Amino acid sequence: MYAYNGKLLDVDLTREKVKEVELSEDVLKKFYGGRGLGTYILWKELGEKWEKVDPLGEENLLLILTGPLTGYYPGMKTSIVSKSPESNGVVGSVLSSELGLELKAAGYDGIIIRGKAKSPVYLFIHNDTVEIRDATKYWGMGGIELYKTLLKEVHEEIRKKEKLKGVPKEPAMIYIGKGGENKVRFAAIMTKLMHAAGYGGYGAVMGSKNLKAVIAKGSGPLPEVYDKEKMKVLLREFWKELFSMTTFREWGTGAGGYSVGHDRSSEPIRNWQEEYHDNEEISVVNFENRTWIKKYWADYGCPVNCMKISYLRYGPYKGSISDAPDYELQAYMGTNLGIFEPEKIVYLSYLVDELGLDGINTGNILGFAAELYQRGILTKEDLGFELNWGDEKAFAKLLHLIVEKEGIGKILAEGTYRAALKISEIKGIDVTKYAVHVKGIAVGAHGIRSELDYTKDISYAVSVQGGDHTSTAALPAKGYTGELVEAFYDSAVICNFVTKPGFEKIIEFGNALSGFNITPEQWLNEIGLRIIHLQRILLLLGGPDVYWDPRKDDDNPPRFYEPLPSGPVKGKAPNREDIKAKVKQYYEEIGYDEHGIPKEEVLEELGIGEAKREVKRIKKRLNL
């Protein structure tokens, strides 16, 4: 076996037991790693009882996984997979963390975490030493405090144990903030103060297990690769291509804060009521001049250097620190809340990171609440204060209410979809039309109405990961621009921003590492399809509190059918009948039946005929 260690750690927090489990080459060939492998493990262990498994219950599994490209390809990501408390399906979430590299160097391809600890703990991994340790004194801490205490202590412990001279690279750590501890459904798993596995709500899953952090340090070599010379040749090509991404290196994704709204008319403004603006204050140049303290920051081994660090050195929010912010947070902590000033956006982004929340879903719920206040549906009495667009202090107050689950915050902590249902019930008025989500997951900060962005018509509507802008569907279903290719990147476990060499070349690189000899066509018609079909099945099984019906839920948010009210493409909006036709076309091409359910004969062809039992349960629930 090449590029893999061939084993996972299996950690039972309830029994306080740790063991190793083997991974067969056959399973790895079929599911690759990361998102694909995680989906398979969840299906095999929980598939027969999926609807009954509470994502925030002891029975759910939390998977931390690597892929075959981890440690070899430029940049560094780690995959987190579980049953999502947002969608009740499977979301493959990745974060910029060296944890995957450290695990691989310690001899593992990932970790299965099951059960629930009696009290707060953290997981410590140093090569073949694996310990479940008390974390009571760290519970309640945010990232900054954790780095000053827990990580510093463990770093010193390892340095002394190995008798290392100087200051060796610190261990990798992922952790949760108060949002995860209090099981806010859109809590993130954090690392390096400001990087997150946001989509999925896996910070809440980690919190439900009383797991504060996972720390790993490996000193062993990475697994051998199949063809080292070919790997080197391709790496040299890739480095040249990636190093040529000068605009990205210079400005990062934050360059989109102005251009996505002004040039593409697809940026969320005031809960997506608009998508065009011409406010230059949010220009990346203003962030550079007023907030940046570090212009080039990269994940381990990445030549792109797209990350920037903002720090407020003076003013009312002095001490706030954030990564630029990136485009998604500029939009969701900025324009979506009617805020365009860099300092205010940095402040709110800092709060989101310290509290351990997903910036996209947080900005989505804040914008939803603000629109309800704008329309008089939520009142000052409901909130305890006024919630006007552009008022960062009010949004900060609401953030704290959400994390502490106090007052209206208890409802909003359930996420936009569930909060919309509850508020509709309380107020006696349907507010779900103001909830901009797909299957419980907030859409990324890229609209579809203008058709000037990469997101189009059915990008979110039929994605197995709902509103996730990094896993969008497209026609043709088996083309190079849809969720099958994105499932490859998530299963290989690499960053979407280092895929410039292209799908075919990166597949070739994976083959040089693993020796699997996978073709692009094989991925699109077999391996990727197998992963997507299993994700689709688990999403439609859902439960225990929310279930999706593809006949009505394979659709865009109602807001996306409202004509754009301003900008160069004013009046533009998708046609509902056109969307329905494209959804049907997607079903046919991907291998679903006319109702959007994976066909049993396709499952047999993909070698997962066992999943027909789940399909039968879906059909029974939908009376089909």
Swiss-Prot record:
SUPFAM superfamilies: Aldehyde ferredoxin oxidoreductase, C-terminal domains, Aldehyde ferredoxin oxidoreductase, N-terminal domain. GO terms for molecular function: 4 iron, 4 sulfur cluster binding; aldehyde ferredoxin oxidoreductase activity; electron transfer activity; metal ion binding. Residues 552-575 are annotated as: Disordered. Optimum temperature is 80 degrees Celsius for the oxidation of hexanal. Signal peptide: none annotated. One of its GO terms (cellular component) is cytoplasm. Binds 1 [4Fe-4S] cluster per subunit. The [4Fe-4S] cluster has three cysteine ligands and one aspartic acid ligand. It is found in: Cytoplasm. Heterodimer composed of a small WOR5-S subunit, with four [4Fe-4S] clusters, and a large WOR5-L subunit, containing the active site tungsto-bispyranopterin cofactor as well as another [4Fe-4S] cluster. PANTHER family: ALDEHYDE FERREDOXIN OXIDOREDUCTASE (PTHR30038), TUNGSTEN-CONTAINING ALDEHYDE FERREDOXIN OXIDOREDUCTASE (PTHR30038:SF0). This is Aliphatic sulfonate oxidoreductase, WOR-like subunit. The lineage of its organism: Archaea, Methanobacteriati, Methanobacteriota, Thermococci, Thermococcales.
